[in-house]
């Protein structure tokens, strides 16, 4: 395979087509990519396996794509010419939209893939708008036409109405059987424009992904915009100004093949001899020290964390291992941020920032699976901006940082949410959104039986169990997509949980004033069941500042001190009972309640478990 013409360096840009596939989860994107690998012959039938491009175990198990992948495909089109197609496989999930935006910037065209049995979903629409913003050519395709439940005519009209094409132009393929895939590849060659760039100018390439390899350091996946990158040049990262020796340059088809150089329009990999992934940031521009470019490629923003959660090792001695594991994960995941923090209840750990709940869950699962750590994560929360009465500002990512004293106003992040659902469920979903302090912004009927609702919702209301509630109210038919939309003034308070009069920081939460009471009652009731009974009565209280809003008591265990008395004088028994009473009284004033680790895990996991399983 290495001698194949499509792997030769220095391809003519006019013969290159760079495209990506936009689809919702489960619409068959990875399966279609598998068929393309088979049809173009880069993977022999005997080596084929399902979801060939999804390398991580978690990706295969959940059937989702997390990291963007790319592969170089040779294709002889109808005109008899040999073309080179670069497929950049993108994730479909809302949490990984920054991966999508980078992949789109590396393409000229996008295949809009829609399940012929389900129709367009919210995330497909969101990514479609992103692609249109980036001026990509859209090739509409209906997948899974072999399904008995497929309704290609109906959904072709729906797609045509949204992107403004003729329903007859919507291609019909089956990723499972391979039907229609050669026609799709021919359409990509015909419709997607060839890449343009200056082959003689200074080299400029955009990093759209990077992975960490234990033997060779950071491997960056790049799309060359201008000039040529070769192994002879030292490469220069424009955002950091650091230069490195280029160890290897090549293409992926679908396994890496060194070619020695990459020229205009080509997609491949560059291995700069870097051990620290922060030196090779995704979205950065690579140039050469010999003939450096003067300006960076635009359009990249650092991904900002939306959700914060504390990660703590259950065994305190695993703290250094957790730090090392997070360092390694950050090499692959530019959006993960973390800083050390301590908790009186949970010991040493890290406050981590994530893009959303699925991101949080996947990072946690990778830490546990790839690094053999056992972790406990605190309830997720968002970033609040608190303005004090003296006009000083405090940014709060952790409930324990909530300032005391006089607070003038609190701002919370809001999102513009787009919900797609069957018309039968509009009432139930509107009721749900209003209960979550949502404001209706608009309502569009895509067809007679599908409606798109636009809401502005506080992010803090979505990250708990909103997705679960939405799915259960619509029998699983609704889909959700959201994007940040600034912040709004909110009436928020911090609810503390007190055990025996002492605050337990791990259970504190920032909630809306109207929901503070129900949170307090739920938490105190749950802890009463989880904390073992003591020799003395333990009050569990929920408080806002110094005002108690809910209380439960853990009843004391009574030891039978009269067991050893057989008959005898009543005063003897009374003396023992009085002595026990005194002891209990003293214990109540000086006794401490030890919350067992299991109770912490159960309380926090049931609190966040509703949301963690939601996606």
UniProtKB/Swiss-Prot annotation:
GO terms for molecular function: GTP binding; GTPase activity; ribosome binding; translation elongation factor activity. InterPro entries: EF-4, EFG_III/V, EFG_V-like, EFTu-like_2, G_TR_CS, LepA_C_sf, LepA_CTD, LepA_IV. Pfam families: EFG_C (PF00679), GTP_EFTU (PF00009), GTP_EFTU_D2 (PF03144), LepA_C (PF06421). PROSITE patterns: G_TR_1, G_TR_2. Its EC number is 3.6.5.n1. Keywords: Cell membrane, GTP-binding, Hydrolase, Membrane, Nucleotide-binding, Protein biosynthesis. Its main location: membrane. GTP binds at residues 26-31, 143-146. GO terms for biological process: positive regulation of translation. It is a peripheral membrane protein. It is found in: Cell membrane. GO terms for cellular component: plasma membrane. It catalyses: GTP + H2O = GDP + phosphate + H(+). Belongs to the TRAFAC class translation factor GTPase superfamily. Classic translation factor GTPase family. LepA subfamily. Required for accurate and efficient protein synthesis under certain stress conditions. May act as a fidelity factor of the translation reaction, by catalyzing a one-codon backward translocation of tRNAs on improperly translocated ribosomes. Back-translocation proceeds from a post-translocation (POST) complex to a pre-translocation (PRE) complex, thus giving elongation factor G a second chance to translocate the tRNAs correctly. Binds to ribosomes in a GTP-dependent manner. This is Elongation factor 4. It comes from Frankia alni (strain DSM 45986 / CECT 9034 / ACN14a). The gene is lepA.
